Amino acid sequence: MNFNNELSDLKNRFLFRTLRVQEYSDVARDRIDFFIWELKFLNCVLHLQSFTFASECGMLDISQKMLEICKRFNTPPPHNAFAYWKEVICKRLCAISIRPDASSDDGFACWKKVIWKTKQEFRAKYSFPKTLLADNKVYDDTNPKFVMEFIDAVVGNLNVLVKINDPSSLHFVPGPKEQIEQVLKELKLLRFFVCFVSNKCTEPQYQYTTFYTHALIEASHIAMVVWLNLPIYGNRNQDLASNEVSCLFSDFMEMKIKSIQPGISRNNIYINVLRALKSTIPHAQDKHAAESGIVETPTHNLMVGLSDQMANLQEMLCLLRDNLIHLPILDLEFHLQDMDSVILDVGLLIYSFYDMKGEKEDTTLEDINRELGFDLPRNIEPIKAMVYLVMQKAFHCNLPRVHGLGYADFLLKNLKDFQGRYSDSLAFLKNQLQVIQTEFESLQPFLKVVVEEPHNKFKRLNEDCAIQIIRKAHEVEYVVDACINKGIPHWCLERWLQDIIEEITCIKAKIQEKNTVDDTMKTVIVRTSSKLARTPRMKEEIVGFEDIIENLRKKLLNGTKGQDVISIHGMPGLGKTTLANRLYSDRSVVSQFDICAQCCVSQVYSYKDLLLSLLCDTIGEESERRELPDNELADMLRKTLLPRRYLILVDDVWENSVWDDLRGCFPDTNNRSRIILTTRHHEVAKYASVHIDPLHLRMFDENESWKFLEKNVFGEESCSPLLRDVGQRIAKMCGQLPFSIVLVAGIPSEMEKEVECWEQVANNLGTRIHNDSRAIVDQSYHVLPCHLKSCFLYFAAFLEDVVIYISRLLRLWISEAFIKSSEGRSLEDIAEGYLENLIGRNLVMVTQRADSDGKVKTCRLHDVLLDFCKKRAAEENFLLWINRDLITKPFSCVYSHKQHAHLAFTEMHNLVEWSASCSFVGSVVLSKKYEPYFSIDLYSFYDFAISRNLPNFKFLKVLDLEHQVFIDFIPTELVYLKYFSAHIKQNSIPSSIYNLWNPETLKLKRPRHVRRCTLLLPSTVWDMVKLRHLYIPDFSTENEEALLENSAKLYDLETLSTPYFSRYHVLNFPIRLEILKLYRSKAFKTIPFCISAPNLKYLKLSGFYLDSQYLSETADHLKNLEVLKLYYVEFGDHREWKVSNGMFPQLKILKLEYLSLMKWIVADDAFPNLEQLYIKVENCNELVVKSAMNIQETQVEDNQNTNFKLVLIEKKTLKLNLSHDEDIPKAFKRLFLCPGIESVSTDRKEKKLTVTGDVDAGSSISCGETEKAWHARVVVPTCQHKCGIVILLTSNELGLGREERKKRRKRRKRRAIKEIIVDIVGGDPY
């Protein structure tokens, strides 16, 4: 608001000057804020002096009073009172605000005292005027824009007073602030009214100008009251008590309903302006002024208890107000005049009632009807129609334009559950809901056709109808929820459901008209799935880089003895990552390195994430490690790599600083360790290189482009001569970029190999795709079947360059209802088919596949594809990615009338800010991103705030808070929730968790500091019959009997992870259970119950005492087991495991780690289908290794199982570099701290050090010299199969005490560097 240019300039200069100084005390900052507050109000009051009505309305002449202040300071009064304010007051304040001291305190107190006394004099003479304006006098100088700006300024200053709760602040107002908040609301509503009138009036009229003047007068008197009386400057010099201020505001509120103009009541001003607007509606400007605030204005003035009809009117107005907030202008463009007419009629009715009520106390609605000439009951009908229309439009505009076709399945399941749980609430809709349920069941075959026949001749019509059906499913869900929560009146819900039934009937007629069901339904019975279900695995082909690969391979294996970096750089899409991965996974390269690890950086990265990724590859994944500080993780990585020859892949580095962060973790021990680095920038590549010059990837030539396209489309087959010409033309369009070629190859690979189809691809691509990857992605997205579009866009919820675990991704898809069910197939299997199809189209990159069955284990998206997903998902109103840099704030998003179906957050404070404005959101995913700049207290605040605000997302189906957040309580109000993953702080779960009757995936973790005791689950958990995957570490149940009785009720449960069972001798596992992970109880060493689950496929046991008999009995009950993992298991006193014929007949993977096993006897026909055997053992003898080798021989030679893989992790020893004699005790210390070391012995006479143990990549090596380590002696175990090694030491000081060492060191010079090199054995497949 720029009322006075001179004052505005002063304020700006003052702000500039104060902002340049950063070191303000709290007192100084409060003074500065207070001065600005006073300056703004003075600006408002001074400007009002220029209006002609000021003197008539009782406005005080502030300028004259300011002259008196000048005289009191014995300063010649300037020609302008404002100039004095600037020279005397403002300059003094600026001078004393920066570094307040005793003298400045006195100066400020003096200034404050003068101003306060001046205001006292103003208050003594000021009162609300009884007569304001002369009759029929028009004031042409009142501008609506100025009125709104003035009100905004007053509202802004009042907001400051409401927010300050610190008694020491100069802005503090003691006592309750309800009066101020009420005045604020009145001013905001007045502003809405002014905005509405100014937007709708087509030409100046007396009524409008009078109304603007009236609004300005009301706002100006509020400004005067506040400026003269508030704030009270802390607790000092309070000459005005808080109750007096409240009385002043009460007088103001009462004044609003008194006459302010002779012969014309306040309400008459509103009536006249509304009548004037009503007469101009046909010619009104086409502006969207029907904001929720203008509906709030008459609603706010409705009296309670007038009549049933008025109560209904109030209810409808509230609905209109609440839904207008979500409605864009385009959805109302044909209804604006009707909307305006409804609002004006309601306003006339309400204000006429007040006007007549003032003249006649017993005024009735009939009197108002006669006076206004319209019938209220009849006029309520168009209001109802408008309310219903706005509610529908508001809901429709928030629906995404991309849907998962599984939503119809989700609705049908919920309809049955809702009608059972909420039968009383839904009784009046029972018949309509049954009709809807029948209609959706009849449409299920059609939706199945859409998924399984994507290339049907009616593809476009089928997909359009399918999307309409799913939109209707969303509407039904919303209506049912509104009925249960009583958020919408019954008349509206009944009308809405009836319209839905009619619209579904129209959709069915459209389907039948084209015979889409009759033509294709016959094929559905015999076809179990189309090629969309699964596509052959795509290999990452590299064409044209063979010479480069061979050259880089030589540099990796040979070259300098020291560490070296191979940098690959080039523009996006050239294949840097593909080339680097090809080298990183090359067996001839990997076999030469002890450790291989990789990480992907990206433009926005987390240092901790990079360290964790590298540590995961080197020493395995461990959740505890995530809570360690960065410096400890970096030190752990460095010490792990120190004794080994390593190969590291660092992908997508953007800046030199990233390399600076990481290079210290990669020690150079002259053992030919290598690092592969990819980047887009030549400067980064050059900066990281040591001996080898950076490699710049070139673009393909036309011949290479065609070969690459041909390879990606046809694989090992050759292209038909008929397609060669058009294929080469398509390859040329790709601009010689490998990435573009890969994307384009995904389009014709899903089509018939016919010239017409390929010509269509070429025509659709056109010439616009040169150097424009987004255009290619857009075309690839355009040809996707509708059921795959939502799955593809959902990748926008993940961070850039983050490896995505398929198990989590597929469960999210299922929970989001993206997957359409099919009889005879599990949802996971169908979802895998969807994913394989996206991979086959080259839209998703596979980063890891399972060794056993070749299924995708992890994946990721190329940067270009991820960027497309984020932008397109936002455009389709599907998913909004929210991070710290997002300019759009939640309130601006709400008032732009747009909510998204799914939200992905990178930071917890974003989630808190958006929670209040996202009621329609269906999923919230908080991605992994660390915020080290947050204090612990701030984290606790956000944890609590998120927990408190989660119920605002009442339609949530997915809530994934696995990273960062530790919630204080479980949001049991979210009845639609299907996927819930979070960290919790409690040691017990409340029984109210049963209210979450929809979850299929429940994953609860706890921070390390609260894991000292098991998590206590209520017995109601076992009544959550829809659970399919339960992940809760270290849990037990409060009611053993309930567990025994109800555990089998979880018919759909497929995964039960890490239960902490302690004392159950019998346990009935759910019949469909497929994954079971059990950890040992503190109370029992053995498993006290028999594991009986006929469909179990994956079993992991950790920490138990087992024997051959128990495993044999278990095998009899687990005929379908495919994966068995035994960790830290002891085999009784004899340490023996006998495996008989026929045990675990379907077992494919057997993994044994850290077993206490001396003898392993395996029958020849045991494990007939075994594909992979992984052994990492302790306290074992050579018989165990021999048994493993026999299994391999049986599988490969007898069973002809050429894919069988045996991995033996044998005993390893450590490699140490000693620079001088002083490092010997450090070597002892290091060895004793390595968890795999079993014995260290020394022989002083023979001058040798013998080390025996299992030192693998997980060793934690720590330096430090202690007397205990120097003198330590460990007895070598009798086990003979250990891989022992003798290390000769040239030093004759071994075993000497510290004093003797010092004496000898003085008598001789320091010896030359000695190096102890120990080869590490094991780890590679035999």
Swiss-Prot record:
Gene3D superfamilies named in the record: 3.30.70.100, Helical domain of apoptotic protease-activating factors, P-loop containing nucleotide triphosphate hydrolases, Ribonuclease Inhibitor, Winged helix-like DNA-binding domain superfamily/Winged helix DNA-binding domain
Protein name: Putative late blight resistance protein homolog R1B-19
Source organism per UniProt: Solanum demissum (Wild potato)
UniProt repeat feature LRR, residue ranges: 953-978, 980-996, 1027-1050, 1053-1070, 1071-1094, 1098-1118, 1119-1146, 1167-1191, 1208-1230
Pfam families named among the record's database cross-references: NB-ARC (PF00931), NB-LRR (PF12061), WH_DRP (PF23559)
Residues given in the record as ATP binding sites: 570-577
Primary localization class, coarse: cytoplasm
Membrane topology: Peripheral membrane protein
Swiss-Prot/TrEMBL keywords: ATP-binding, Coiled coil, Cytoplasm, Hypersensitive response, Leucine-rich repeat, Membrane, Nucleotide-binding, Plant defense, Repeat
Recorded GO CC terms: cytoplasm; membrane
Molecular function via GO: ADP binding; ATP binding; metal ion binding
Further remark: This protein is encoded by the haplotype B genome of the allohexaploid Solanum demissum.
Entry coiled-coil feature ranges: 421-444, 536-558, 749-770
Family assignment from sequence similarity: Belongs to the disease resistance NB-LRR family.
Residue stretches making up the NB-ARC domain: 611-864
Biological process terms in GO annotation: plant-type hypersensitive response
Function: Confers resistance to late blight (Phytophthora infestans) races carrying the avirulence gene Avr1. Resistance proteins guard the plant against pathogens that contain an appropriate avirulence protein via an indirect interaction with this avirulence protein. That triggers a defense system including the hypersensitive response, which restricts the pathogen growth.
Intracellular or extracellular location(s): Cytoplasm; Membrane
Domain HMA residues, every copy: 1209-1278
Taxonomic path: Eukaryota, Viridiplantae, Streptophyta, Embryophyta, Tracheophyta
